[in-house]
């Protein structure tokens, strides 16, 4: 009889745990709707965290899930952030820009600063979640209060989408990824002004009129797989989220190499 009673108690406990979620951690918050190119949208609430070194640019390799490297250097200058699902958008949010600010705790300056999305973080702590580099998180603080703000760990914040601006003369830039060859071309795109993010890239081979759609590989990297060798130089058409397009004519030359950077002469201005 005692065994039966014990089994009943255990069964009730299991059901209660299932009904209650069976978890001691914080509740998981579903992601919000995707952020679009509505630049007149009001400020939205989010939660902010930070990672890496206190004054650093996030990842130890100065990169992230977009594939963009050296984010510690200009023009990013370490002012970068991971975005959750509706911000990162499986890589199609890479390069987009946001004004961010906080009002509490007291160390917050309440003044907006601009960050670039170069990484992802899917921790379900808020409908919108920015996981900043240490430098970017501290930039929301009053002067001299950066360390105090970082000690807060997780804070409430506000954000809004803004157009990306780069220093004068900065053009759309392409990096041919390691492992690329005449039958497999993988290209990272960066320094895209205005919308910042790219929703489609197309490639035109030398001497051919047709544009061939590239596939999003991961992050900000687009690829072309082909059974027949591609003929350089290559022109690349870049289309951003709002539907704007530009063409980088013959941007990847005849003697192109893997792991090489090619700077175009065009920009979304």
Curated annotation (Swiss-Prot):
The signal peptide here is: 1-24
One cellular component term from this protein's GO annotations in UniProt: membrane
Provide the GO biological process annotations: plant-type cell wall loosening; sexual reproduction
CDD domains the UniProt entry points to: DPBB_EXPB_N
Q: Which Gene3D superfamilies match?
A: Expansin, cellulose-binding-like domain (2.60.40.760), RlpA-like domain (2.40.40.10)
Among PROSITE patterns, the record links this protein to:
EXPANSIN_CBD (PS50843), EXPANSIN_EG45 (PS50842)
Glycosylation-annotated residues: 34
This chain is encoded by the gene named EXPB9
Q: Which organism is it from?
A: Oryza sativa subsp. japonica (Rice)
The cysteines covalently paired via disulfide bonds are 66-94, 97-164, 102-108
Protein name, please?
Expansin-B9
């Amino acid at each position: 009889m005692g065994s039966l009673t014990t089994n009943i108690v255990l069964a009730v406990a299991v059901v209660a745990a299932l009904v209650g979620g069976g978890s001691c951690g914080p509740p998981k918050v579903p992601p919000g709707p995707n952020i679009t190119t509505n630049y007149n949208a009001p400020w939205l609430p989010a939660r902010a965290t930070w990672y890496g070194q206190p004054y650093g640019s996030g990842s130890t390799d100065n990169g992230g899930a977009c594939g963009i490297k050296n984010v510690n250097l200009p023009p990013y200058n370490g002012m970068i952030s991971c975005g959750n699902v509706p911000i990162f958008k499986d890589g199609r949010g890479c390069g987009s820009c946001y004004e961010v600010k906080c009002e509490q705790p007291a160390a917050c300056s309440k003044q907006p600063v601009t960050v670039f999305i170069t990484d992802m973080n899917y921790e379900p702590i808020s409908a919108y979640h920015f996981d900043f580099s240490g430098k970017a998180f501290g930039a929301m603080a009053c002067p001299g209060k950066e360390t105090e703000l970082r000690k807060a760990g997780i804070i409430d914040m506000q954000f809004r989408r803004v157009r990306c601006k780069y220093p004068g003369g900065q053009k759309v830039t392409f990096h041919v990824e390691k492992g690329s060859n005449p039958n497999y071309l993988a290209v990272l795109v960066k320094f895209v002004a205005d919308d910042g993010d790219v929703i489609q890239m197309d490639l035109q081979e030398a001497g051919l009129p047709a544009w061939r759609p590239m596939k999003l590989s991961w992050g900000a990297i687009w690829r072309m797989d082909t059974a027949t060798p591609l003929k350089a130089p290559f022109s690349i058409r870049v289309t951003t989220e709002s539907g704007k397009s530009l063409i980088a004519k013959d941007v990847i030359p005849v003697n192109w190499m893997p792991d090489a950077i090619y700077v175009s002469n065009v920009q979304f201005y």
